[in-house]
Amino acid sequence: MTFKGFQMNEEKLEIGIQDASSENCQLQESQKQLLQEAEVWKEQVSELNKQKITFEDSKVHAEQVLNDKENHIETLTERLLKIKDQAAVLEEDITDDGNLELEMNSELKDGAYLDNPPKGALKKLIHAAKLNASLTTLEGERNQFIFSYLKLIKPGRA
């Protein structure tokens, strides 16, 4: 080969080296940007995991509160039904023989009043009205918890 051939090869190699060096710099810059983006994504994933744990804890708490409220509503409903039945019996007793006190004492001995509800028809009706109001309030709270629970489970749908 001649000297001129070596010069041409050398020029081609230098151009190739410059191109490779330029591409290497671009790739290093791209790698640096990708590493920065990966760090941002890592932080976002960490934050989302924290939110997920918080939402799961809130969900468990909401389910427990909802369960407690439903149990309370069930208990109040049972008591209210018992009181309604007792009010009907009292009404029959009043209209039948007028011996309310004797009938109430008999029921007390039989264990009909487990929670010591008030004595007397009017007091029982007032007690029943209070229980009914409490039941209505608890049902409203239960519905609100259900709505909140659904919002936690399916954000944007409830």
Swiss-Prot record:
Record key words, sorted: Coiled coil
Family: Belongs to the cTAGE family.
Further comment: Tumor-associated antigen found in several cutaneous T-cell lymphoma (CTCL). Expressed in 4 of 11 Mycosis fungoides tissues and in a T-zone lymphoma.
Tissue note: Expressed in normal tissues including colon, mammary gland, ovary, placenta, stomach and testis, as well as several fetal tissues.
Name of the encoding gene: CTAGE3P
Provenance organism: Homo sapiens (Human)
Function: Tumor-associated antigen.
InterPro entries: cTAGE_MIA/OTOR
Protein name per the record: Putative cTAGE family member 3
Residues forming coiled coils: 26-96
